[in-house]
Amino acid sequence: MIDDQRRGARPGAMLITGAGRGIGAATALAAARSGHDLVLNYSRDGQAVRGVAESIRAMGRKAHIIQADVGQAGDVQRMFNEIENEVGALYALVNNAGITGPIGPFMDTADATIEQVFRVNVLGAMQCAREALANFGRHGTRGVIVNISSIAARTGSPGEYVHYAASKAALEAFTLGLAKEVAAEGIRVCGLAPGSTLTGIHAAAGEPDRPARIAPKIPLGRLAEPAEIAEAIVWLTSPSASYITGTTLACAGGL
């Protein structure tokens, strides 16, 4: 059994990329409610992430904000340098930042879109994971990495964003391989694959009405709320999930 002390907050902070809105913001708030300090990464919307930070601080937890585009290697390095200098130890990384590009058939998808999606969703997550592992090593932390995938990795999303689905499938393969590589160090690497969730990602992809269109195809008959996904992510970082690694958990309403 897991005792109450192990269920509590752990030393070090949780870094969430793309923490200003949607699943990232909901995860930050859920983690704060569980007693954790946060490092909140954002790329563009500083006002949104400052609002999340204010809510976290109102709960009595720390929130450190860092602007960085995880699709740029230099930004990732700068972010982790700042974490080392200003925050110190991490105990968890949530690789949440991700983009889809416009919705449409693969043949209509520009090369630049495909490259940018892979740069953020795959290379950015890999670089953040590598820097987080270095932080764990410096501080002697048996940390946790949670990579946010998508149910699209398993459905393929034909006619919508095959390139995005492929990027998330790559992320799931990375999750499995890295988990096996670092398991002997007591470090866990997990994934979570949300289904369609009520966030701004649909409008950003050019189809704000997509939630209403796809809800009937989901066995539970509705899209997820960001808070539902967030609770699963925070659970994966907790001692309650201490024997789970290398697995990507589907949280997709039955898809």
Feature map (PLM): residue ranges:
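Alpha-helical segment proximal to the catalytic Tyr-Lys
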Residues: A134, L176, K180-E181, S242
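C-terminal substrate-recognition "lid" of short-chain dehydrogenase/reductases
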Residues: M126, R222-C251
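Active-site helix of classical SDR
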Residues: A129, S167
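Residue(s) in the substrate-gating loop at a strand-loop-helix junction
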Residues: S150
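Catalytic Tyr-X3-Lys loop
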Residues: Y91, M107-M126, V146, L171, ...
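Short, small/polar-rich loop/turn modules that mediate ligand/substrate recognition or access, typified
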Residues: A183, R188, I244-G246
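Conserved glycine-rich cofactor-binding loop
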Residues: G20-G22
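Conserved mid-core segment of classical short-chain dehydrogenase/reductases
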Residues: Q77, T100-E115, R138, G159-H163, ...
